[in-house]
């Protein structure tokens, strides 16, 4: 799949950015704080409806009261158009081929991306929440059933936790709790099942990529870690454990197990990478994981996602940079942000390059 | 809004905006439409709103909206009195009745169990439903709460209460879009959902 055009309005520091003609390889250059990362983030947002911010409001350009991102897409021979608009007010408007789409789950997945960024290191070092988020965004882009189950699970969980949080005031009605637990098990088991299947595929692709980078010296793996012992019939195991934990959940006022408590462990030579990998090893691990994400999407929908590369060559010497770029050469579309654009241009002589300044296009030099 | 230095107009727009499905733009359009209309027409509208508000009550048996209590459905001799369909809102009765596929009685529970909105079973007409099942000769209860999380929880909760009473409990088939509400489902979908109901 390829993004053929991009129009960004009031997104973060970008006032108006019109890129009517995108290429296979697109280099985005500019000074610090000019809006290069924000440009990549606008593509990421157009695809996943996610930002690194807690609220959409934070992504509205200071002083403005809405933002919008539009993109033209070529996907398996078909032309599509995507549009997302936030505000004024708090409503999000989604459009697909000009038609309003009411549900996020009918929109996400139309444009699929893998984002390589500096802060990816948090996947290894950070909290389980960050790893769950990465898995959710990845799988949701290729599996709408997953996104729907996840949304349902989240909604049921919010109701149940509300009941539990008020348990100290008013003992919750056991039958009501059970009515929510039943739905929690149903949607939760579905979420876990799909995540576990994804983790199996990802682990293999992850190890392969990592072997290629580490010259076969290290083995890497991923392991989905469920917050309860999930053997046999998942739904039954989840239900049984919830039943057992009910008094504890009432005492603590919250739901103690389920996909919202699960984790995914990064391992290197069998040990948890969070504790046993060096800085450089952690960098290579997250890089390998991102490549595994790419393979996962490619395998799931038989189509290549769009690749966003935000200064991933940072800290690498020339040989490694060249080696890393070779991974990307066969991919149909790349957006590359780099402070060393001249060097990237030498590697990709056919690339289009866009210079950003103050959140707008400074000039567009397109090579033919 | 400087463009309307007119308190009564702003008040009218604000009142209209409170209604479901009416945004600020529609509220403005309606307000201007009313102001352009003949005074007699506006009086007719205001009168009918007041009249309906005064005459229409909830049926003391099924909580449908009605001028005569009990309502026409509850007193009809042509309905199957061994079947009760449980719905969230009076609006849902209209949607289901229009399909013609259901010939039993109704019971409106006035909402769904929704902890996030602070609504528990005791806030709904569930006790009244259980009393009806005990008194009347009911053989089957069809639960037609909305297919969203709260509606689903209500269905599970009701089936747990009703099944021990020896009454068959079924759920409207999942022909409807998830998260949708009954009043927006079309008649064909609803009729299919009634015919394909599954036992709980
Ligand atoms: N909602 C917003 N409104 C206006 N500016 C914003 C908003 N959110 C973020 N910014 C600003 O956008 C600026 C540009 O950010 P961006 O991360 O895109 O820079 P960059 O070009 O990638 O720089 P670097 O080369 O340092 O990575 C930042 O200074 C940031 O404060
Ligand atoms: Mg940046
Ligand atoms: Zn009645």
Predicted regions and their residues:
Chain B
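Conserved phosphate/pyrophosphate-binding and hydrolysis machinery centered on Walker-type P-loop NTPases
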Residues: 2, 20, 39, 52, ...
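Cys/His-rich Zn2+-binding cysteine-cluster or related metal-binding knuckle/ribbon modules and their
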Residues: 2-9, 31-84, 89-93
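S-adenosyl-L-methionine-dependent methyltransferase catalytic core, i.e., the SAM/SAH-binding region
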Residues: 10-18, 28, 34-37, 65, ...
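Signal for well-folded cores of large energy- and translation-related assemblies
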Residues: 17, 35, 50, 63, ...
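Extended interfacial segments that mediate partner engagement and assembly in macromolecular machines
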Residues: 27, 76-142
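Glycine-rich, flexible loop/turn motifs
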Residues: 58, 70, 92, 109-112, ...
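Long C-terminal interaction/binding lobes of large macromolecular proteins
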Residues: 130-142, 147-200
């Amino acid at each position: 799949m390829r993004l053929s055009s991009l129009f960004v309005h009031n997104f973060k520091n970008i006032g108006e950015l019109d890129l009517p003609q995108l290429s296979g390889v697109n280099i985005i250059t500019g000074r610090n704080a000019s809006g290069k990362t924000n440009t990549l983030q606008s593509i990421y947002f157009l695809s996943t409806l996610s930002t690194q911010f807690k609220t959409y409001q934070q992504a509205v350009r200071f002083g403005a009261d809405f933002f919008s991102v539009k993109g033209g897409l070529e996907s398996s021979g078909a032309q599509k158009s995507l549009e997302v608009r936030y505000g004024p007010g708090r409503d999000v408007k989604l459009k697909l081929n000009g038609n309003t789409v009411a549900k996020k789950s009918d929109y996400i997945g139309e444009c699929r991306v893998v984002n390589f960024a500096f802060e990816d290191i948090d996947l290894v070092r950070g909290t389980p929440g960050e790893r769950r988020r990465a898995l959710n965004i990845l799988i949701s882009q290729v599996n709408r059933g997953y996104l729907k189950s996840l949304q349902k699970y989240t909604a049921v969980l919010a109701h149940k936790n509300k009941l539990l949080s008020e348990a100290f005031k008013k003992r919750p009605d056991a039958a009501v709790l059970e009515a929510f637990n039943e739905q929690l098990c149903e949607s939760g088991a579905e979420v876990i099942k799909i995540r576990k299947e994804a983790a199996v595929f990802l682990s293999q692709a992850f190890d392969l990529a990592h072997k290629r980078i580490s010259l076969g010296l290290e083995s890497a793996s991923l392991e989905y870690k469920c917050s309860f012992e999930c053997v046999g019939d998942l739904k039954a195991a989840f239900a049984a454990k919830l039943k057992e934990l009910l008094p504890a959940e009432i005492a603590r006022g919250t739901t103690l197990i389920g996909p919202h408590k699960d984790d995914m462990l990064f391992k290197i030579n069998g040990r948890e990478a969070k504790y046993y990998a060096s800085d450089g090893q952690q960098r290579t691990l997250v890089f390998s994981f991102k490549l595994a994400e790419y393979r996962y999407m490619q395998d799931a929908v038989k189509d290549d996602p769009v690749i966003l590369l935000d200064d991933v060559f940072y800290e690498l010497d020339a040989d490694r940079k060249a080696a890393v770029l070779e991974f990307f050469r066969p991919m149909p579309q790349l957006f590359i942000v780099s402070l060393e654009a001249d060097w990237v241009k030498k590697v990709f002589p056919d690339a289009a390059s866009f210079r950003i300044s103050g959140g707008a296009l400074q000039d567009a030099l397109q090579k033919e | 809004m400087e463009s309307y230095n007119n308190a009564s107009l702003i008040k009218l727009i604000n009142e209209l905006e409170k209604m479901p499905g009416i945004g600020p733009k529609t509220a403005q359009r309606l307000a201007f439409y009313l102001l352009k209309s003949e005074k007699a027409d506006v009086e007719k509208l205001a009168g009918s709103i007041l009249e309906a508000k005064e005459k229409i009550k909830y049926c003391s048996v099924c909580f449908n909206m009605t001028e005569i209590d009990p309502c026409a459905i509850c007193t009809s001799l042509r309905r199957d009195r061994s079947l009760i369909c449980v719905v969230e809102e009076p609006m849902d009765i209209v949607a289901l009745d229009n399909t013609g596929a259901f010939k039993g009685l109704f019971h409106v529970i006035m909402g769904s169990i929704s902890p996030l909105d602070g609504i528990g079973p005791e806030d709904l007409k569930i006790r009244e439903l259980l009393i009806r099942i005990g008194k009347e000769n009911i053989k089957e209860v069809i639960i037609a709460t909305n297919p969203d999380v709260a509606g689903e929880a209500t269905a599970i909760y009701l089936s747990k209460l009703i099944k021990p009473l020896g009454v068959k409990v079924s759920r409207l088939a999942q022909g409807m879009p998830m998260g949708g509400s009954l009043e927006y489902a079309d008649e064909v979908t609803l009729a299919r959902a009634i015919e394909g109901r599954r036992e709980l």
